[in-house]
Regions:
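Residues that form or flank phosphate/diphosphate-binding pockets in enzymes
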Residues: 22-23, 96, 117, 138-139
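Short alpha-helices
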Residues: 135-152
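Short beta->alpha connector loops at strand-helix junctions that form conserved
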Residues: 16, 42-43, 129-136
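An amphipathic alpha-helix/helix-turn recognition signal
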Residues: 26, 121, 138-142
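Short, surface-exposed acidic/glycine-rich loop or hinge patches that mediate macromolecular interfaces
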Residues: 18, 92, 116, 134-137
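Internal catalytic-core helix/loop-beta-alpha segment
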Residues: 71-129
Length: 191
């Protein structure tokens, strides 16, 4: 385990060599929405160096993302203990369909790049393999959101997480039923 990197916390998400910063940003938002504490990614195509003023696209508008630790690392699996269960999310023969997938408590979801597949060396770390039942490949960030949403619903249906009322689930103000002071001052017609 490298000391300069954080210890892996499962459940977690690992992106293998993502190509686009906006997909990393949207995956970060999905992690925040579904209570995933860490987003790891490998490769050199997406770099975020706050010292150089680099940030993810739209980061300043992403509410709640600060509860997710961003972890760029070339060997992220080394940071997790033995309880972690790496799950490759990929279109491949003999993989489990997400519809019936039973999510491990300590899952580490592994997603390949936008322009390729998960390399064999990475697949060798994975204990489970799952595919999303869609007619076409999904955008990377969309795939992350779909899997994490399914995880939340599966855990709720199996009594592992409470099914909270919307008022307790949302951590931000949304919807017309709770108008903001700005909307109140403008009126409902925007004037």
């Amino acid at each position: 385990m490298r000391q300069d990197l954080p210890r892996g916390v499962a459940p977690s998400v690992i992106l293998i060599d993502p190509k686009y910063p906006h997909n990393v940003g949207a995956a970060l938002r999905a992690c925040s929405c579904f209570d995933i504490a860490q987003l790891w990614w490998t490769g050199q195509r997406v770099t975020i160096d706050p010292v150089k003023g680099e940030r993810l696209p739209r980061e300043e508008r992403m509410k709640g993302y600060r509860d997710v630790q961003m972890c760029p690392a070339q060997q992220p699996f080394d940071q997790f203990d033995r309880k972690a269960v790496p799950v490759a999310v990929e279109v491949r023969q003999q993989s489990e369909c997400l519809t019936l997938f039973e999510h491990p408590d300590h899952a580490v979801y592994v997603f390949g790049p936008e322009d390729g597949s998960i390399p064999k060396a990475v697949l060798g770390h994975c204990h489970r393999f799952v595919h999303i039942p869609s007619r076409h490949c999904l955008n990377l960030a969309t795939a992350v959101a779909v899997v994490l949403a399914h995880r939340r619903m599966w855990r709720q249906l199996n009594g592992k997480e409470p099914l909270l009322p919307l008022s307790e689930m949302l951590h931000e103000q949304r919807g017309l039923h709770r108008a903001s002071p700005t909307l109140d001052s403008m009126g409902w017609d925007g004037k």
